Amino acid sequence: MINDTISDMLTRIRNASIVRKKSVLIPYTKMNLKIAEILEKEGYILSFEINTNKAISITKKTSETNLRMLKIYLKYYKKYKTNFYKLNVIKNKKALSDFKNLIKLLKGKQGNKKTPCITNLKRISKPGLRIYVNHKELPRVLAGTGIYILSTSKGILTDREARFRGIGGEVLCSVW
């Protein structure tokens, strides 16, 4: 049995992105659903869907239980292994042919490397140590390139939304 579903979700997403998986299955909870909605809205994942699978209970072989899972589709971007200093040099035919070869290389599949959009996920407030902040104390993640996800009285919000609304809450995790 999983006691901390948020840590489990973050660990599953982190491990799947490290091995470049296309999607990952996560146990469904309302909190996990809200975090997945925020990750999709902020552009860290492509999309998600709710899967319902029938499973036979171990204790009662005749009854069936519904296992609801979140299927999260991870997002990657292509990183090119080329030097872009060639782009501003088109003065002779050789440079033009080099430029055309560079364009062919960029369109082709040579030199492409999938890099995850999520660099890291970190659980901040844990079941043993809850961390609460108000909107004035809330720091920025990597100078604004990442987000904090907070549990507030108005629901699950990002740090930017919480600052805009002027409310604080429990800092669940950080994503960058």
Swiss-Prot record:
GO terms for cellular component: chloroplast; ribonucleoprotein complex; ribosome. Pfam families: Ribosomal_S8. It is found in: Plastid, Chloroplast. GO terms for molecular function: rRNA binding; structural constituent of ribosome. The keyword Ribonucleoprotein applies. Its main location: plastid. Keywords: Chloroplast, Plastid, Ribonucleoprotein, Ribosomal protein, RNA-binding, rRNA-binding. GO terms for biological process: translation. Part of the 30S ribosomal subunit. Belongs to the universal ribosomal protein uS8 family. One of the primary rRNA binding proteins, it binds directly to 16S rRNA central domain where it helps coordinate assembly of the platform of the 30S subunit. This is Small ribosomal subunit protein uS8c. The lineage of its organism: Eukaryota, Viridiplantae, Chlorophyta, core chlorophytes, Chlorophyceae.
